[in-house]
Amino acid sequence: MSVIGWLQISLLFLAVLVVVKPLGLYMAGVLSGEPNVLSPILGPVERGLYGAAGIDPTREQGWLAYTLSMLAFSIAGFLLLFAILRLQAWMPLNPQGFGNVPPDLAFNTAVSFVTNTNWQNYGGETTLSHFSQMMGLTVQNFVSAATGISIALAVTRSFARSAAPTIGNFWVDLTRSTLYVLLPLAVLVAVAFVAMGLPQTFRASVEATTLEGVKQTIALGPVASQEAIKQLGTNGGGFFNVNAAHPFENPTALSNYLNIFAMLSVSAALLYTFGQLVGNRRQGWAFIAVTYAFLIVGVGIVYWAEAQGNPILSQLGLDPALGNMEGKEVRFGQAMTALYATVTTGLSDGGVNGMHGSFTGLGGLVPMFLIQLGEVLPGGIGSGLYGMIVFAILAVFVAGLMVGRTPELLGKKIEAREMKYAMLAVLILPLSILGFTAISAVMPSAVASVGTAGPHGLSEILYAYTSAGGNNGSAFGGLSGNTLWYNTTLGFAMLLGRFAYAVPVLAIAGSIAAKTRASTSKGTFPTDTPLFAGLLIGIILILGGLQFLPALALGPIVEHFAMLSGQTF
């Protein structure tokens, strides 16, 4: 570790804090329908879309209608993307001449991008045409992120309103999130990426001659535009197989900084947006403080673990001064790789600039554990906010038990109905992750896809289902996931992680919205204080992480101690 490394990390976190308030206020305004600087340009587009789709923007929906609209839109998106992938050979913009994507891989990929997971069992530059990348994947990068924002906005309204039968209009929320938040930000970031050297072209490839005189074909494509929304929407799916470690997807230290900044800023600002819309900005800052506490500790552990290096390699005579550089890009180094890995898993981004499977046991444990906590730190775009609210509901319930009062969150009483839905949502992740991992660990055909022996082999399976269930998309690279079993089961894990979580959350929103908002009294437990933030951290650790401890003990924890003892597999 070095002072420069810590300065790089600190500056990034400070830069995000600087934009949290202005970006949060902007989103609070545009998502509420207030006029803004883009209204003269995008207002007619918004109204035109409503007219073409036959949507009345003034007609709001109850939680069930909102949920059904969200599910219908997601199903339509899945079917469209699946069709594009299966018919790729006959689609335009296919200069590479790629064939149709096999059905099981097309299912996995379509589910992956519709659920904002972006798990990739393929190499983008060797499998997908420009049409599939742009009209299929990039479109879903926008609308899946907008879907997450919409759900979070519905939950936010439920706390802001009093005795309300509705929580908003899904189609309006989806449209505004796309037009006024994601699209303009993506244009700005894409232009910046082009200036930093990312390709933006319809050419398939360019042929170059290496220093050794060997001809090499270098893949090209519309990379910058996809990279921008990949990060802003916490999607994470790369244009190239090695994601942000590829020099055309992340060429410099500056582009790496912008990648991390883009993926973290919108999700963090949404927490402030929540505070603004419910009339308690301190609540938004309390949530941000919780996320920063986890991220700072997480990046510190990863940075330290990777900087220590691998003692087994040191015993073989390799210089340990640079730490564990296996799977890392020299142009980024230990600090920026550790920061990227921590942020991408604290969010639901899943993009990588280094190979997580090449981290040390302790270094690989942290990214996996952050996903298992529910990716609420600050989590995916939108999904992180409503996931944080679920844990906040559980935290005030525990606080209410301790002081003998009916728990309240922002003036709304938390009763049995909300607790049942909250616990149902929290149990989805371990059920999906541990269930599929256990089955795969004893199936010979599934174990055959594992590329590493010993505890790291179990970690590869556990990380895969953790990533899928947590809608993250990153992976330990030793697992060959492009098989019928993994394509299918990972797809179902992604569906559970997205929709089996979102439906109970929207049910909570409907129940909360119908309650009368009470004024604060002397007996009310404040939820915008350091005390509550500490309680929330404890609840996230206990309910979000403790259930995975036995599995982690058999995987990365054992691997760490095996490395220290010099044992190999």
Curated annotation (Swiss-Prot):
Keywords: Cell inner membrane, Cell membrane, Ion transport, Membrane, Plasmid, Potassium, Potassium transport, Transmembrane, Transmembrane helix, Transport. It is found in: Cell inner membrane. It is a multi-pass membrane protein. It holds the Pfam family KdpA. The chain crosses the membrane at residues 11-31, 64-84, 135-155, 179-199, 258-278, 285-305, 384-404, 423-443, 490-510, 531-551. GO terms for cellular component: plasma membrane. It comes from the Bacteria. InterPro entries: KdpA. Part of the high-affinity ATP-driven potassium transport (or Kdp) system, which catalyzes the hydrolysis of ATP coupled with the electrogenic transport of potassium into the cytoplasm. This subunit binds the periplasmic potassium ions and delivers the ions to the membrane domain of KdpB through an intramembrane tunnel. The system is composed of three essential subunits: KdpA, KdpB and KdpC. This is Potassium-transporting ATPase potassium-binding subunit. It comes from Rhizobium meliloti (strain 1021). The gene is kdpA.
